[in-house]
A protein has these predicted regions:
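Short, small-residue-biased leader/transition segments that mark boundaries at the very start
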Residues: 2-8
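Core segments of small alpha/beta cavity-forming domains
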Residues: 32-113, 192, 206-207, 211, ...
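Extended alpha-helical interaction scaffolds used for oligomerization/partner binding
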Residues: 140, 152, 161-167
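Short flexible coil/turn linkers enriched for glycine and charged/polar residues
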Residues: 126-131, 162, 184, 199
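Transmembrane-cytosolic junction motif
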Residues: 13-33
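Surface-exposed, charged secondary-structure patches
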Residues: 106-149
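Cys/His-clustered metal-coordination modules, chiefly Zn-binding fingers
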Residues: 168-228
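Mixed-charge, low-complexity intrinsically disordered segments
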Residues: 147-159
Length: 228
């Protein structure tokens, strides 16, 4: 089945305008990036700490694990608004559109038994006014599609585990530093006005109207690509 990981990366996703079904997606071409193309985790950590001495590798990778699981759960729940704060505008809109395709077809892509097997730093660079931190994550999960009305499986099965490797790119504004408590999986306060807020699909604080994404203040997911 076409799990969440198979629809990541803007450059790798396309839609076929079919005469039979205008929502028919083309399975993206997987781009396999050899491990040799990545930097060593020690070098990556050193590069990040050179510009952000408070960066904590263990905390960041733990947050990445939690976020990855949260992504899969939100995909199954078909409620991408809970992810708004953690993604860039472009990536959020891409994923929201893809998820809407399942909703329109009255299908649910179920992701179950999600297990993050490993996660490590793979690259760090500064481009333009952005810091870009790359992570490689390996996972195991069950992935199948059901009809929302009947509950009948239309693709995949409940017993087969899928092993996959992903490349996650996180960005933030260059010059931002790690602050205690700045990386949280449950963001409930607007970083601009401090008010407790619900994250809407537009990503705006309901009190001050500011667009809320973690990329302005901390790391935000800009790309997640299946590489193996």
């Amino acid at each position: 089945s076409r799990g969440l990981g198979d629809v990541y990366k803007r450059q790798a996703i396309a839609y076929a305008i079919s005469s039979k079904n205008k929502h028919t997606p083309i399975r993206p071409v997987q781009t396999y990036q050899p491990a040799s193309n990545f930097d060593s985790e020690e070098n990556v950590e050193r590069k990040v700490k050179a510009v952000d001495e408070m960066f904590n590798k263990e905390e960041f990778l733990s947050w990445t694990r939690s976020l990855f699981v949260k992504l899969q759960e939100a995909w199954t729940a078909r409620d991408w608004s809970t992810i708004r704060v953690f993604e860039t505008n472009e990536l959020f809109e891409q994923h929201q559109k893809q998820l809407q395709g399942y909703i329109d077809r009255k299908q649910i892509n179920v992701m179950e038994r999600i297990c993050v097997l490993s996660v490590k730093l793979a690259d760090f660079k500064q481009t333009g006014n952005k810091d870009v931190l790359t992570v490689v994550l390996k996972s195991r999960m069950n992935d199948y599609i059901i009809d929302e009305t009947t509950g009948k499986i239309v693709k995949g099965d409940k017993t087969t585990d899928r092993y996959s490797t992903y490349k996650l790119d996180f960005i933030r504004t260059t010059g931002e530093k790690t602050k205690p408590g700045s990386i949280e999986i449950n963001t409930t306060n607007c970083p601009n006005c401090g008010a407790p807020t619900q994250i809407t699909s537009s990503g705006k604080c309901e009190y001050c109207g500011s667009v809320i994404t973690t990329g302005e203040h901390s790391w935000a997911l800009s790309n997640l690509e299946k590489i193996g």
